[in-house]
């Protein structure tokens, strides 16, 4: 992928999430503004779930749990402030995807960041994100 800016990276995460959940048979709804703590609402069998989308272009695959914005990139919120959020959908620079229940992030005690992994960490230490990796063809 060529050099892209933060806005484009965010659009990649959002569009990949829409594609994934649509292929899983969900109805995907987008809010009219961007002031809420979720990016998508997904519905299947009458059950609504909220999704926050994050994407990274870093080599490490690090995803910040903090939301930043404005002209100076100031932190204005944190995913962990919203225990009612259902899923964190993440995309890395290789367009690999993860769908992580936020309750699992909270249970693990992560407060600022997670690292997207395709395999377990050495000694299985830390939050094991590889368990939540998904593909378009997965069954929901």
Where does each model-flagged region fall?
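Mixed-charge (Asp/Glu-Lys/Arg
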Residues: 1-36, 41-140
């Amino acid at each position: 992928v060529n050099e892209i800016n933060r806005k484009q990276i965010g659009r990649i995460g959002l569009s990949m999430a829409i594609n994934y959940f649509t292929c899983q048979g969900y109805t995907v709804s987008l809010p009219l503004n961007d002031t809420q703590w979720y990016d998508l609402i997904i519905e299947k069998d009458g059950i609504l779930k909220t999704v926050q989308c994050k994407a990274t272009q870093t080599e490490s695959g690090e995803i910040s749990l903090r939301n930043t914005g404005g002209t100076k990139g100031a932190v204005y919120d944190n995913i962990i402030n919203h225990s009612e959020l259902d899923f964190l959908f993440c995309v890395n620079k290789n367009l690999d995807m993860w769908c992580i229940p936020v309750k699992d992030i909270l249970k693990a005690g992560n407060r600022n960041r997670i690292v997207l992994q395709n395999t377990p960490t050495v000694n299985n230490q830390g939050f094991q994100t590889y368990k939540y990796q998904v593909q378009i063809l997965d069954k929901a």
